[in-house]
Each structure stands twice: as C-alpha cells, then as structure tokens.
Amino acid sequence: MFIIKYYYWEGNKIFSPLVHFRKRNINFLNNQNIKLAKFAGFCYGVKRAVETAKKLKQENPNKNIYILGELIHNTDVINELESLGIKTIYEVPEHGEGICIVRSHGEAPEVFEKIRNAGFELVDLTCPDVKKVQQKAIELAKNDYFVVIVGKSNHPEVMAIKANADLYSDKVAVATTIEELEPFAERIKAHKKVGVVVQTTQMVSSLNLVVNYLNTIAKEVLIHNTICQSTAMRQKEAKELAQESELMVVVDSKKSANTTHLAEILKNCTKTIHIENDSELDENILKNITNIGITAGASTPQVIIDKVINKIKGGI
C-alpha cells in the first residue's frame, strides 16, 4: 500500500504575492481588442529585490555595490541597475570591499561564507518563498527522507535548494521528467520514505508527472507543493485569457523560468509569441488578429508592459 501525503503551501493570502492588481484593460483601436492580464509583471519577491538594490545605492553612493549573478532575468532591468552603478558579477573574488547582494534565487551556504570571507558586506535578497523551499528541503533531509526536488537542475534557485539539502543528506535528486528520476529508482525503492519540494516557478504538470512516477516505486511520498501562489495564479489567469484571445503576447526574458513555462502552457491554448520587449514585436503576426491577450513574467517592469501595449495600439 502506498501512503501519499499532500501538504499545500500555507503562506500569505492567495493574492498577496502579486504586486500588480488591475482590471483587464480593454482598448479598441484598429479593430483590435487588447486585454491585459491582471497578474502580469513584478511579483513581490522581484519588486523587493529591485527596490532594495536601488535603495542601497542611494544610501551608499560612495560604496561599491555588486550583485552575484543577475538580480532578475530581465536585460532591461539589469542594464538600468548597471547605469546606476550597481554591478553584476558572476564569481566571488578572493578579496573585495563594498556590498555584495545575493539575488532572489538564493545561493548555496558556502557562497554566503565566501562572500563574507572576501570582505564584503552581505545583503541577502533571496525571495522569502524560495527560503521556505530551502527550509522544507532541509527539514526533509534531516528527517531521513529521500529528497526529490522538482525543477531544472541548472537553474540557480534549484542549485541553491539542493546545496542546502546536501548539507544534511546524500539522498537528494533533481528532476522534472521520469527519465531524470530513473537513475535514482533503485535507491528510492530501497528507502522507506520520499519527500518532494518544487522549484517555485515550476509547472504543476511537472510536479504531477514526478509524483505519479514516485507513487509507483516509493512506499511513502510526502509532497510539499512549493510552487508560489504568484506563479500559480499567473498561469491560471493567463490560460483563461487565452481562451478568449486569438493571440497571446507573453513578455519577459527568454531566460526567465516562470515566463518560458507560461509561454509553453499558452502555446497549447492559442497562438502565442514570447517577446522580451516591444522591439521584438512583428507587425506581420498581428495582421487579421482582433482579440489580443497580454501577460508578463515576474521579472517584467510595468514600463516594458506599457511600451508593448502602446506599440500594439499604435499599429506597430
């Protein structure tokens, strides 16, 4: 007999992670109806990170401010931060001075230590929701669960979650497909219990796929659905908007996990394009289209969304 336990996220109220709340804007121009998703743009974790980085520079104009890795996956925002004197670095130097920011995706514990040892003042802007996933993974590892992280192994958030769990267990796997789990199958079968956490920006379909497979090989499966509410609500609402749209425009970086997943979901619903900003809009794809839906990933600032809308309204 399989024992399956589901524990769903019990954090803030369901709408609180979302920064932008708006009615769908319906514009009529050139016989086109444009509808903007309510849940489009910065989530609260991204908004917090960007605003804090800018505030740090304002309060410390003479200090060097560094971000380890891109603060968020949006080129326009990174360029803006660079223009303010906030530099992105990809490795921690042996020696440094000033402030070093840990981005919203989080980092491995040894990276925090390395930053401090280098002489930097450390500012941790790991998203609170990501912190919760790390803590759940640690809790499972400490309680002798075989930990399965549903996520992309090369994504910085997942790498940080795994690094935290690895401190307490050598039984940790990362997967979004059955093929990625199969090498661990015998170890999972031999173990009494399996615990699951999820990358905050993953698709529910990936979680279900992994869980269904685990149910066939594990004796007990404990599932923490740690997909953040902003991701879940963004995907749900965008699917509903797609049902009444001939074309969906998804705005945000191609490197953004939550946005690529969003575009992937919508492509199964209606014609969909994924653009980083208004410069990538092609007038040919908008020809003979009456109903256009627009959504945006968690790393998209409002100014970029507005530029996309205005360009479509202006007939490109």
What is each PLM-predicted segment?
Residues 4-6:
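N-terminal start and proteolytic maturation junction detector
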Residues 21-316:
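The feature marks the mature, well-folded catalytic cores of soluble enzymes
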